[in-house]
């Protein structure tokens, strides 16, 4: 018996509605689905990056002196690892640049070793250190790759740490400004993008509150270690205060003496999270905003408005330094761009009871419980690109829509994991799609840097984790670099103009060797939706959508 037309119509409407809902779900979760390099502005750059200590090696050669990273590693706090060899970028920079060229990168973000360039922290320049940085920069430019240089990435010369305590002393402002001028003078004719300090918020918390990264200062009961050197209740605030003053001193020096001749830009990078309330209660919503004040506003509010967030000043009291009127004016507006570092999201609940404690550190002052990824785990991050889009929109709304580079993003895997890294492709596809969505929201994003190139040594508690586009064979005397699957078939293809979609990732996972297309059985839309559904189920992803952006479907979907 034939079905009545009304029944068939209702069935068709249901199928179409279901498919539309699923499409909206997947695109909302993973960001823009089908896109190519051509969908981004012409001046938008795609790059990768790393840091000097994690990639250069040659730690004891050609005049370089120890940094606080060396001291940390040699003391046994890096699970037996150190940066003595790393990826041997000091000797293999030409090979690395050729790999960048083959990958299709527009830009390379790297840091310069302070103790290699200025072995005494200040004073005479080391000719060998100068030559290495010049060689790297020239090699990049000769291959059409834009250099983005970071002045400081956790590697203060140990001599300055020994002399006056490094970042907890105001003397650092003088020495950092001197160091910055050496870099501007020597390399500024070719380097246009300068990041003064990499993720000062994370550096301060790890180095001065928990003590699990250099310079390993903390005090009980807040230490993650057995050390008792330092004071966790105020040193994180003091270190960031001096970082902000050092940054602004260097930025204004550049603007005053070099910008008109070199036409470059100075910024700073910040580690961010997508921060969402654990429940819909008023207390948790307020706590999530307070957590963002502490993580991001700690750096951005002085740069944008000249002072720390009110919540920080209220909860930390006299333990957080105050800016003088002159310092406030110097710090306010002292950036041309902001580097955003983003990997994952956090959920937050209120913990105002922590404020009753007389002895408090940064975490207690924040008065919030944090739920989310274990930053020291080998487990892969959940795929949560909507958090990045939300964060980019907050920069637009709260801080005047500054020029932004995504300075770090990527997926962590065990360092000995398979080269068939389709999971990295999934997260990269989602996050680049989220950046494209944010651009369409009118966020002022200038570039996206994947972490890391080629790979790097993680000298901290998370040593077994790799973020690299290439696998570096540490057992090979030549440190052979092998491209991972998605680098070969995803990143390179996208950067060279090929369109990418979630369907490509599904097909790549089904046939990672040939990346061949499966037979066309369904219509294009049905096949795309099927791939999307299988993608969501197969990977047992847990999505929690707490504060949807306008036009998106609010939901809480927990799968397995």
Curated annotation (Swiss-Prot):
EC number(s) stated in the UniProt entry for this protein: 3.5.2.17
Topology Peroxisomal: residue spans: 32-517
One GO molecular-function entry: beta-glucosidase activity
Pfam families cross-referenced by the UniProt entry: Glyco_hydro_1
Bilayer disposition of the protein: Single-pass type I membrane protein
Disulfide bonds: 218-223
Catalytic residues identified in the record: 199 (proton donor), 408 (nucleophile)
Keyword Hydrolase: yes
Binding-site positions, a beta-D-glucoside: 54, 198-199, 343, 408, 467
Keywords: Disulfide bond, Glycoprotein, Hydrolase, Membrane, Peroxisome, Purine metabolism, Signal, Transmembrane, Transmembrane helix
Function text: Involved in the conversion of hydroxyisourate to ureides such as allantoin, the major form of nitrogen transport in legumes.
This protein's name: Hydroxyisourate hydrolase
Organism this protein belongs to: Glycine max
Encoding gene (name): HIUH
